[in-house]
A protein has these predicted regions:
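Heptad-repeat coiled-coil segments of the DHp/HisKA dimerization-phosphoacceptor module
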Residues: 123-124, 174
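Phosphate-binding loop of NTP-binding sites
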Residues: 1-118, 122, 128-142
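Short gly/Ser/Thr-rich phosphate-binding loop of adenylate-forming enzymes
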Residues: 124-125, 163
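Adenine nucleotide phosphate-binding catalytic loops in nucleotide-utilizing enzymes
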Residues: 98-102, 132, 137-193
Length: 193
């Protein structure tokens, strides 16, 4: 691998987010992405074998359902950039609470280097969960957290959403300005991804 690895986790939206990120990166870089949703310890290990010296970027989906699984996944992947899509109730039976789910999924930051970034959903109470359950002391480097979503308190946010026969449109905002976007898929949940 000659380039960087991005890790993607969350309760929902991992596969769609991985596909969207990879679709953008593939236009410019030789990119490897997780096949379908092979995001378990075995699936991630298989994906890591796909990386070679020609790979410029990798987008690896990392799913967990039990405590300690993310520790093993980040040991394999060592992402330099991470995305935390959402914190829901998937696997709450094994993890006990949304706080514990966030704490376990938040371990994705463990190997972020100095200058690495965690992109986290800033919608609803997810931002508060990330701020309280993903401490920066968990990471080997000094990373930053950037929030995205449909709320204006996010660094990257979408508004003016509407659906039509062509898909879901919205206006994307960041520090450099705004841009009208049309997704070929429907649903505000896809805008959040």
């Amino acid at each position: 691998l000659s380039g960087r690895i991005s890790g993607i986790t969350g309760s929902v939206g991992k596969t769609t987010t991985k596909e969207m990120i990879a679709a953008v990166l593939e236009t410019k870089y030789r990119t490897v992405k997780t096949y379908k949703n092979l995001n378990s310890q075995i699936g991630v290990a298989l994906m890591m074998f796909e990386l070679d010296e020609d790979t410029e970027l990798a987008v690896i989906e990392m799913g967990i359902s039990m405590p300690g699984e993310m520790d093993r996944l980040v040991e394999m992947v060592k992402p330099e950039c991470a995305v935390l899509t959402n914190i829901g109730v998937s696997h709450i039976g094994n993890l006990g609470s949304r706080e514990n789910i966030c704490k376990e999924k938040g371990k994705i930051v463990s190997y972020l280097p100095d200058g690495g970034t965690l992109f986290a959903s800033g919608n609803g109470d997810v931002r508060q969960l990330v701020e309280t359950q993903v401490p920066s002391t968990r990471c080997k480097g000094n990373y930053k957290v950037s929030y995205y979503g449909t709320e204006s308190g996010c660094e990257y946010f979408a508004d003016e959403m509407s659906a039509n026969e062509d898909g879901q449109s919205f206006v994307y905002h960041d520090s450099e300005g705004k841009e009208k976007v049309l997704l070929s898929v429907m649903g505000i949940h896809n805008v959040n991804n």
